[in-house]
Amino acid sequence: MTSNRKNENEIINALSIPAVSNHSAQMDLSLDARIEDSLCIAEGNNINPLVSASTVQTGINIAGRILGVLGVPFAGQLASFYSFLVGELWPSGRDPWEIFLEHVEQLIRQQVTENTRNTAIARLEGLGRGYRSYQQALETWLDNRNDARSRSIILERYVALELDITTAIPLFRIRNEEVPLLMVYAQAANLHLLLLRDASLFGSEWGMASSDVNQYYQEQIRYTEEYSNHCVQWYNTGLNNLRGTNAESWLRYNQFRRDLTLGVLDLVALFPSYDTRTYPINTSAQLTREIYTDPIGRTNAPSGFASTNWFNNNAPSFSAIEAAIFRPPHLLDFPEQLTIYSASSRWSSTQHMNYWVGHRLNFRPIGGTLNTSTQGLTNNTSINPVTLQFTSRDVYRTESNAGTNILFTTPVNGVPWARFNFINPQNIYERGATTYSQPYQGVGIQLFDSETELPPETTERPNYESYSHRLSHIGLIIGNTLRAPVYSWTHRSADRTNTIGPNRITQIPAVKGRFLFNGSVISGPGFTGGDVVRLNRNNGNIQNRGYIEVPIQFTSTSTRYRVRVRYASVTSIELNVNLGNSSIFTNTLPATAASLDNLQSGDFGYVEINNAFTSATGNIVGARNFSANAEVIIDRFEFIPVTATFEAEYDLERAQKAVNALFTSTNPRRLKTDVTDYHIDQVSNMVACLSDEFCLDEKRELFEKVKYAKRLSDERNLLQDPNFTFISGQLSFASIDGQSNFTSINELSEHGWWGSENVTIQEGNDVFKENYVTLPGTFNECYPNYLYQKIGESELKAYTRYQLRGYIEDSQDLEIYLIRYNAKHETLDVPGTDSLWPLSVKSPIGRCGEPNRCAPHFEWNPDLDCSCRDGERCAHHSHHFTLDIDVGCTDLHENLGVWVVFKIKTQEGYARLGNLEFIEEKPLIGEALSRVKRAEKKWRDKREKLQLETKRVYTEAKETVDALFVDSHYNRLQADTNIGMIHAADRLVHRIHEAYLPELPFIPGINAVIFEELENRISTAFSLYDARNVIKNGDFNNGLSCWNVKGHVDVQQSHHRSDLVIPEWEAEVSQAVRVCPGRGYILRVTAYKEGYGEGCVTIHEIENNTDELKFKNCEEEEVYPTDTGTCNDYTAHQGTAACNSRNAGYEDAYEVDTTASVNYKPTYEEETYTDVRRDNHCEYDRGYVNYPPVPAGYVTKELEYFPETDTVWIEIGETEGKFIVDSVELLLMEE
C-alpha cells in the first residue's frame, strides 16, 4: 500500500513546539549535527538487552508442542514429544535452565545465592540424565510392547525418575528466592505432571496394580493444584514488586509480565488438561490471555544521550502508561481495520520526521458487533491517514522503526514506518504485508521486530506457518514529544471461529463469546490461560438472568457431542445451558470455591451434560445463571465427541463409578450413609440404559450390585411401605360402643401411611422410578391435606440421631414435621420444571407408554444435599431434603416414637414427593448427647406439670358434662339443660391440652383418651338436645330455612353467632311446629331489644291457647315462677338450682378462668429445633365450633305451654325499634 506524503517544505508541528529565531536555529543545528553524528552509530537492528530470545523461544516452543499432545495422544506423538522435550531442556549447548534463571534474575534485579544456583543446576543435570534414560526406554518399549524385558526396564526407570523429580521440586522454591527460581520451578513441575500422566496412560500395560495407577493419578491431581497455586502466587508477587512510578520501571514490569506469562502461566494453564480421566482423547486447548511487546520507542541511545530514549523523554508515569496500554478484561476480539494518523516534526530539509501520532482501530468479537477505539490525535487532516485492512488476517509479525528527531535540544520520539506481515489462516495462499510509511530523515533509527520478543514455535518451517501469536490490539503511549505504539498479542491457539473438530475434545473459553448480559469479563486468576466470565445473580427477576452466548462451528455434521462446563461458585447455583434454541441442561450445582475474588487452582469444578447432540441442534452455546442470590464464574465450555464405542465405554465407566460409589471404600458390601434411596434408583436407571451390545455381562453384574444396594436401603429404612402401595384413611377415635379407639390408632399408625382422601399415589414417572405421592392444596387451613406415619418406639435406639430424607419433584408450602419431644419443622418450596426433556428430544415415552429414562433429559444433581436447618421457610433449589431428630431414652411402655408428618394447608400449596427414608444417622455423643438429655428432662418435667393440670381441668369438665345428664347412662338430659350449658361444658372440655398434636389435629396426643371420652358425651348431649327441641333451625345457623317470613328480616353474624334481626314493626317470622297434645313444653328464647317498643315471641294454636314472651330494652323487674329477671340480666328460669354452676347464665358459663391452665410451650428449645407448638386455632377443630358466649344485653326467658292440638305456631315480631333473637327452643317436658 502506498502511503500519502505532504510536501517536504510544509512544516506541521502537531505537538505545538514553540517557534525559534533563525539565529537560534543555526546554533542548534550545529549542535544537532554533532548529536546526529553520535546517534548514527546506534542505527540498525538492535535488541533490548533485557530480552533473551532463547528464553522466550524455549517457553513458546514447549507450550506449543504441549498443545498438540493434550489428553491422550497417539504413542508416536508422545515418543516424538519426549524426544523434543529432552532436546529443548537439555541440549548440547548452553544449559537452558541457567538461561531461565539468569533471565528472571536480570528482570527483577535479584540474584539467587551461589549455593542455590549450584544445587539447582546440579540436580537438574541429574534429572536430565534420568529423563533421557526414561525417554529412551519408553521408545524401546513402544516399539515392542509385548517384550517383557522392555516392560520391566521402563517400569523400573519410571518409578526411579518419578521419585527423583518429586524430591527435587522443593529445591526450586527456596525461601526468599521463589521469584528468580520461578521459571525453573514451572518447567520442572511441568515435567513432573507429564511424567505422572504416563502412569495413567501406560501403567496397567507396564504391570502396575490398579491401586498404584490410581495413587499416581491422585498425586497428579494434588500436585496440579500445588504447582499451579505456587506459580500464580509468586508470579503475582514478582510482578507487584516491579511496580514503580516512571516509564522505565513500567518497561521492566511489562517485560516480566510478558516473559513469565510465556514461560510460566501458559504452562500452568495446560496442567488440568493432562488429566487423562477428564480428557481421555486428544484435546484442543486455547490460550486467550493478552501480552504486550515493548513500546516502539528508542531504548539504545549511546552514553551521554540517554534523554533520547523514549522512557526518558518526559514520558508519562507508570500508572498513566498502564492505564493507556493494558486493556480491561473483555470478550476476545480480532482487529479488522487500522487507520493511522500522522504528524510532522521538522527542523530542516535534512532533519525531519513524519510519524504515527494517533490511530483508530476497528475490532470485533467472534460473531459479534463491530467496535471502535481511538488513541492519540485522530482529527488532523494535514497528512492523509493510512488505512490498513486486517479482516480475516492474522498479523503474525510486526516490524517497526522507532525514529528520533531533534528540535533544538528536545528529542522527539515517533514511529515513521511499520510493516504488518499477515496470513489468512483459512487460506494460507493469502499472505503478504501491509505497510505504514512516512518520510524520515532523523538522527537515529531502531528496528523493533516482534519475532524477537515473540518468536515462532519452530525455525524448521516458515514463520507464516509456525508463528505463535497474532496481533490483537494496539495501544499508544503519549507524551509531549513522544508517541510510542504498543502491540497487544493473543496466542495462535485461540482460533477465530470456535471450530469444533470430530475427533478431539475442544475447549472453548467463555471469553470467546459474542454476547454478555448481566455479567462481566473479569481478570483470570492466572491459571486459566486468560480471562473468565462472571454471571451475576438475578435478584429474583427472571428477566435479569446473567447470560453468556458463544458462537461455535462444527466441521462434522454427523458427529455427536456432549458439553462440559468448567465453573466456580461459592454457593450452590442453578445453571442452565442451551445449545442453539434448545435448553439441554438445568441443574443445581454444588459450590466449588470459598471466594470468587481469590480463586485457587482447585476452586473450579466440572459439570458434564449427558445429552448428546449434533451440529443440527444449533451453532450457539450459552449459559444462564438461574440463581437469585448467587454468582457463577464460567471458565470454558468443552465439546466431547461421542461415538458408539466411546459412548458405550463412557457410559459403562460412569455407571461403574456410580455403582461403586454406593458402597463404602472399606466394605464393598456396606451402603454409604449418605447414599439416598432416590440416588440408588437413578443409578439403577443408569445401569439399565447401558448397551446390551457392548457390555451385556458388565451390565448384569452391575445390576446385581444395584439390587443389593436397594435391599440394603430397604432394610435400614424404618418407614413402613416407603414405596406407597397403600394409604389408609383417617380412623374414628371412638368405636361403636363409645369407648376410645386411641390405642389402636397409635398402633395402626406404625404399620403404614395414613392420609387425607385427596392425597393420591402415582406410578413412577420420568423423575421417580417407583410410586410417589401428590398432596394438593386445600381451601381451609383447618382441614389440610396430610400424610403421616409413626415410627414405633421398638424401632428406635436410645441416644441416636435419625434422619428423614427424600426427593421432592416440586412443591409449594409443603410442611414437614418430625415430632417426638416437640416438633422439628421445615416449610419447603422446591421449584419444578415444565419438562425434563430438551426441545431436541421428540419422544420421552417408551414403546409401551412407559417413561423413557434413557432419553436425554435435564438432570438434577442426585448427590447434592441442600437443606435448610434453621426452621425458617426457604426456597430450595435442591430437590433433596433432609431433616434430622435426636432420640433420647426409649420406653416401650410409653411408646412415644417419632411421628413423620407431611402437610399442605394453603390453597396454592402442592407437593410431589417420593423415595422417603427414615434412617439411623449416628449415635449421639458430646454436646448433642447432653442436649438431648436436657431436652428429655424438660419434656418429662412439662409432662408431669401437664398431668397435674389435666387432672384438675378434667375433674371440672367431667362434673360439668355429667351435670348435663340425668344419670351415668348418659342417655337423657336434665330437664333444664339448655344449649348454652352444653356449649359451656364443651368449652371446659377443650381446656384439656395435648389432646391432639398441634401440628396435625388428627394425631392423638397424650390426653386423647380422656378428651375423647368427654367429647363423645358432649356429642351425645347435642344429639339429645336436637332431638328434644321440636323447632327446626331455632339457632338460625341455617339462615331463615324452615321459617316463614313476612316483610324485611335478616340473619346476621354477630360475635361468630347467627342472629335473627327484625328491624321493622310490620315484619314477622313464624313456623308451624308439630307437638303432642296433652304434653307439656317449655318455650325458651334468648333475645335482645334495641330502641323503644317490645319484641314478642308468641306461641298459639288455631283457636285461643295463646302465650307470649316479651322483651324490652330496659325492663322492670318481672316475676317468673321461682325466679326473677332484671334488665340486661339474661338468667333463665332455672328453678331452685339457679345458683348451681351447671345452671349459670351464658356469661358465667363461658367465663374464662385465667388461672385454670399453664402456658404449654415446647421444652426442647435448642437452636436447631423450631417452636411450632404455639396457639393454634385449628388445634382441636375436628368438627367443633367454638361458640363464644352471648354478648351482654341478651336476655333468656322461658314459659310453660300445654298444647291441646297437634300443631302450634311460633311467631316472632316487634312493635317498634329492632328485635334481635339468638335462639328459640321448644322443649318437651320429661314425664
Curated annotation (Swiss-Prot):
Source species: Bacillus thuringiensis subsp. wuhanensis
Keyword terms of this UniProt record: Sporulation, Toxin, Virulence
Coiled coil feature spans: none
More details: Toxic segment of the protein is located in the N-terminus.
Superkingdom assignment: Bacteria
Name the record gives this protein: Pesticidal crystal protein Cry1Bd
Family membership noted in the UniProt record: Belongs to the delta endotoxin family.
Family matches, as InterPro entries: Cry1Ac-like_dom-VII, Cry_V, Galactose-bd-like_sf, Pest_crys, Pest_crys_dom-III, Pest_crys_dom_I, Pest_crys_N_sf, Pest_cryst_cen_dom_sf
GO terms, molecular function: signaling receptor binding; toxin activity
Reported function: Promotes colloidosmotic lysis by binding to the midgut epithelial cells of lepidopteran larvae. Toxic to Plutella xylostella.
GO-annotated biological processes: sporulation resulting in formation of a cellular spore; symbiont-mediated killing of host cell
